[in-house]
Amino acid sequence: MKKIVYLSGGIGGAKLAKGFYNLNDIDLTIIVNTGDDENIHGVRLSPDIDSVIYALAGIEGQFGWGQKNDTFSVNEEYKKYIPQEFNLGDKDLALNLFRNQLFSEGKSLTQITNIITDKFDLNCKILPMSNNVVSTKIKTSNGKLLDFQEYFVELKS
């Protein structure tokens, strides 16, 4: 059995992880970017970890993020209270609420990712690049410092 350790980030990284996952006779460990993790609407999101899990489970959304056949009922209702650009599906929200519950119990992101990987019955190890918060920041030409999700999603940059 060959051991493969793969560093993954973004939607493209999740697609390549799926390719490795589908190889025969390998022991796969995927170390996933957490620089895009962020709190949105009071919920801590780990989008790159989720994209890898969804891709390996075969349930990734058509654009490579979120879950296929997801609904956005909570998101639409929430827009009545707070204007927003970020769309989080109901199934995706459920996973992130579960992650937040585990954080509130004192578990680390590594422990939480292992639990979620087991829930999806995946036969590999998925690890966050860090248990600490490491944020990707973008400094604009006018000097404003933005979180990655704000830059990428809200400004559509």
Which positions does each model-derived feature cover?
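Thiamine diphosphate
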Residues: 9
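Structural beta-sheet core signal
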Residues: 6, 30-31
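Short glycine/serine/threonine-rich phosphate/pyrophosphate-binding segments
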Residues: 12-17
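Extreme N-terminal starter segment of soluble prokaryotic enzymes
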Residues: 1-5
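A generic structural motif
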Residues: 24-29
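Electropositive, gly/pro-rich neighborhoods at or near active sites that engage anionic ligands
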Residues: 33-157
